[in-house]
């Protein structure tokens, strides 16, 4: 006997492939097994038993009828028996070899080919059916995609995250504030708009949390591991979807093999119905063997004809059923849009409205999965949802950033508030909202932030920074922050990315915006209305605006500080500045200004002006600053100013003057008449000498002359007895006057980078000057007398 297992190699498949076999493929598989058993059984009988047995006919050649075996038919037998004739056996005078010869000869010549080869044909046709059915599981171009899909599908189905994601979505309206522990929820009712969970899903959702809660110590560790595995699954699903949706080779291959099976079914059915009647029990055989055996006609018995005829009809029945399944498969393939798959029902059941529809081979495989068990596609859809992925990221974040770890990052910022700074995270940990002591929250390069209701736990929050971090704020959270938030800093590539809710924070005192206007909007520089910001005192805008935004005038009645940083783009229209009647501080940095704007001189309340990084060459307009009677700080640094006009003396209320990083070579003597000056910064210029009139600045406390070309200092400079800081580094000084002893308040003296050979020992008389405040080469310091050094090193 030939065991059926020998043919296993033709149809051997991975057990996991069963999920891609709809009911008709399973039925066809069982039918092929039955047909194969028929064929193998017939072949076994054919090989192990006699095929045909022949006896010679004794009638003379002239009397031979058309059918040598006619006398053996039932009618002939009954007639002979009716005569009640006594019969005796006939001697044929043939030996065994002659019988064997006649049997073989008649088998080959007289027996119809269908009767001879029927079992072999059954085996061959069945094997072809098997190959057609499993070909796409073996062909490299399709099997690789199928194996990859089955692998991912099994992991997605078994992943605990699938159940938890469905649970989270279904019960989100009933869940309390999120914590850093496992996000496990028992679904009892369905929230509005979140859909219903299927019965099978609901059972799993309820069972899983019970199992988790029973072992709390293990859950956290396992949840973290499961979260990492689910995160990897999301990436695999994304890449697999992109790869499989590109083509339809699986769909085409399945159609081709089905069409081939249908064609073969019709061919088998036709020729079997035609030739099945050729299987007969008695076979007439006429062969010219009279010279060898003495007989020319024989009557043969096909010993397996009766069994083969029954097997043939049984085989035809199986083939018919098999053909019907193939025809139904073709109907299913062409009647339905199998290259598109919609998750609409899954979206309705789970509430995950962002699950995308898929196409091509991806859609076709999901249709096949639905024929096996639609639960697979429902659970697989979880890993196509961005909502689910974001929740998973949130869970992983909560595990990674515990409240204890976040508290380690707390520190005081420049405004003195307790700040938590988070940078380049995949999301915002829910554990942040457990730190009620946080006063300032800085979020940088965090994608798609959505503030949860837990934001209301940050009762001390007064400052928020969003740097390249888009944020959505629910209405309830807007109400919470509207009167509570005092400072907000927002930075994006373009200003139109700034969230609109920012301009509705009516309790805001400081607004800092950074981003570019699109090229077509830069000249107009349109900004959202600021009318809601009734308490705004500070407005900072870093962009490429062509003019001062008109909406700045919305806060003209209470704005005290305005900063415009234009990154070198020329600011043309500044007339809006005239309306800022209470403005105290104005910064126009890198605005491409070549002259001091006249609109500034209308700001009667102005106290500080900063014109850094512009293209100022002449400051003749400085005379008009006498209208700004409250101006105490003027920063004209980092420009191209070549001289200071004489009427600088009109600025008698000026206390701080910054002229560093310009092209000054001389100073007017009238500068000494600015008697209110306490700080004068002239570093990084080309000054070769100083006017003696600087000694008239009796209020001067800070004088910076570093990085110039000074060769000597006027003795009158040491009349500035209140001078605390004197920076003379990197000049051409060859000596320091002993009159430096008159500077009793001096606490910081820089002399590095000069041509000094010795230091005057009178430095020891500067009571406030210590070693830490003296910046000079070590060799020069060591040249001071020991008692001077000891005095300077005293605490």
Swiss-Prot record:
SUPFAM superfamilies (alphabetical): L domain-like
Catalytic reactions of this protein: chloride(in) = chloride(out); iodide(out) = iodide(in); taurine(out) = taurine(in); 2',3'-cGAMP(out) = 2',3'-cGAMP(in)
S-S bridge residues: 54-300
Glycan attachment positions: 63, 301
Membrane topology: Multi-pass membrane protein
Signal peptide: none
Pfam family, one: LRR_8
Membrane-crossing residue ranges in chain numbering: 23-43, 117-137, 265-285, 313-333
Keyword Manganese: no
Superkingdom of source: Eukaryota
Cell compartment(s), UniProt: Cell membrane; Endoplasmic reticulum membrane; Lysosome membrane
Coiled-coil segments: none
Family: Belongs to the LRRC8 family.
UniProt protein name: Volume-regulated anion channel subunit LRRC8E
Encoding gene per record: Lrrc8e
């Amino acid at each position: 006997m030939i065991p059926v297992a020998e043919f296993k190699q033709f149809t051997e498949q991975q057990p996991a492939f069963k999920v891609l076999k709809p009911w008709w493929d399973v039925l066809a598989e069982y039918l092929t097994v039955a047909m194969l058993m028929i064929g193998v059984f017939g072949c076994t009988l054919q090989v192990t038993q006699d095929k045909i047995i022949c006896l010679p006919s004794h009638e003379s050649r002239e009397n031979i009828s058309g059918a040598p075996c006619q006398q053996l038919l039932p009618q002939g037998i009954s007639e002979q028996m009716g005569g009640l004739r006594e019969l005796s056996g006939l001697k044929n005078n043939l030996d065994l070899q002659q019988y064997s010869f006649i049997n073989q000869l008649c088998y080959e010549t007289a027996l119809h080919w269908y009767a001879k080869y029927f079992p072999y044909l059954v085996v061959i046709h069945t094997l072809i059916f098997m190959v057609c059915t499993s070909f796409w599981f073996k062909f490299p171009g399709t099997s690789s995609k199928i194996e990859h899909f089955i692998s991912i599908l099994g992991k997605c189905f078994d992943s605990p995250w699938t159940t938890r994601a469905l649970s989270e979505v279904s019960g989100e309206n009933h869940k309390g504030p999120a914590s850093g522990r496992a996000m496990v929820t028992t679904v009892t009712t369905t929230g509005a708009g979140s859909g219903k969970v299927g019965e099978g899903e609901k059972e799993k959702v309820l069972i899983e949390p019970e199992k988790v809660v029973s072992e709390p110590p293990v859950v956290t560790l396992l949840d973290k591991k499961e979260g990492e595995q689910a995160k990897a699954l999301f990436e695999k699903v994304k890449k697999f979807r992109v790869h499989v949706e590109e083509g339809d080779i699986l769909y085409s291959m399945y159609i081709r093999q089905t069409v081939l099976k249908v064609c073969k079914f019709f061919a088998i059915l036709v020729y079997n119905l035609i030739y099945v009647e050729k299987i007969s029990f008695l076979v007439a055989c006429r062969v010219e063997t009279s010279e060898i055996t003495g007989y020319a006609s024989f009557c043969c018995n096909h010993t397996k004809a009766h069994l083969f005829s029954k097997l043939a009809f049984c085989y035809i029945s199986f083939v018919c059923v098999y053909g019907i399944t193939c025809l139904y498969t073709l109907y299913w393939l062409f009647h339905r849009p199998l290259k598109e798959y919609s998750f609409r029902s899954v979206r309705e059941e789970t509430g995950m409205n962002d699950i995308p529809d898929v196409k091509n081979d991806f859609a076709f495989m999901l249709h096949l999965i639905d024929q096996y068990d639609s639960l697979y596609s429902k659970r697989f859809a979880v890993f196509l949802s961005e909502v689910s992925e974001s929740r998973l990221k949130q869970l992983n974040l909560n595990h990674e950033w515990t409240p204890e770890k976040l508290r380690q990052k707390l520190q005081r910022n420049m405004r003195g508030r307790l700040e938590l700074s988070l940078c380049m995270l995949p999301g915002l940990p829910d554990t942040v909202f457990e730190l009620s002591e946080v006063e300032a929250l800085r979020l940088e390069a965090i994608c798609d932030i959505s503030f949860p209701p837990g934001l209301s736990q940050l009762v001390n929050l007064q400052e928020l920074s969003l740097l390249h971090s888009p944020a959505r704020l629910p209405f309830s959270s807007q109400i919470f922050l509207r009167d509570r938030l005092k400072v907000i800093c927002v930075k994006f590539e373009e200003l139109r990315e700034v969230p609109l809710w920012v301009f509705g924070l009516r309790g805001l005192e400081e607004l800092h915006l950074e981003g570019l206007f699109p090229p077509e909007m830069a000249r107009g520089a349109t900004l959202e209305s600021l009318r809601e910001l009734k308490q705004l005192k500070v407005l900072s805008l870093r962009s490429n605006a062509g003019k001062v935004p008109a909406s700045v005038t919305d806060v003209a009645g209470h704005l005290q500080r305005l900063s415009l940083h234009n990154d070198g783009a020329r600011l043309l229209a500044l007339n809006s500045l005239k309306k800022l009647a209470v403005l105290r501080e104005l910064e126009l940095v890198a605005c491409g200004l070549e002259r001091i704007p006249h609109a500034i001189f209308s700001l009667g309340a102005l106290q500080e002006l900063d014109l850094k990084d512009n293209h100022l060459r002449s400051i003749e307009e400085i005379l008009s600053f006498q209208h700004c009677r409250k101006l105490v700080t003027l920063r004209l640094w980092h420009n191209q100013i070549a001289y200071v006009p004489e009427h600088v003396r009109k600025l008698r209320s000026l206390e701080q003057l910054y002229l560093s990083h310009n092209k000054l070579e001389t100073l007017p003597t009238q500068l000494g008449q600015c008697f209110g000056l306490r700080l004068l910064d002239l570093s990084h210029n080309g000054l070769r000498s100083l006017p003696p009139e600087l000694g008239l600045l009796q209020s001067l406390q800070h004088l910076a002359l570093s990085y110039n070309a000074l060769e000597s200092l006027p003795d009158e400079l040491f009349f500035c007895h209140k001078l605390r800081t004197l920076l003379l580094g990197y000049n051409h000084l060859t000596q320091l006057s002993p009159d430096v002893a008159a500077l009793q308040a001096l606490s910081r003296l820089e002399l590095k980078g000069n041509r000094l050979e010795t230091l005057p020992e009178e430095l020891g008389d500067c009571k406030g000057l210590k070693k830490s405040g003296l910046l000079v080469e070590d060799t020069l310091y060591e040249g001071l007398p020991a008692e001077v050094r000891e005095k300077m090193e005293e605490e």
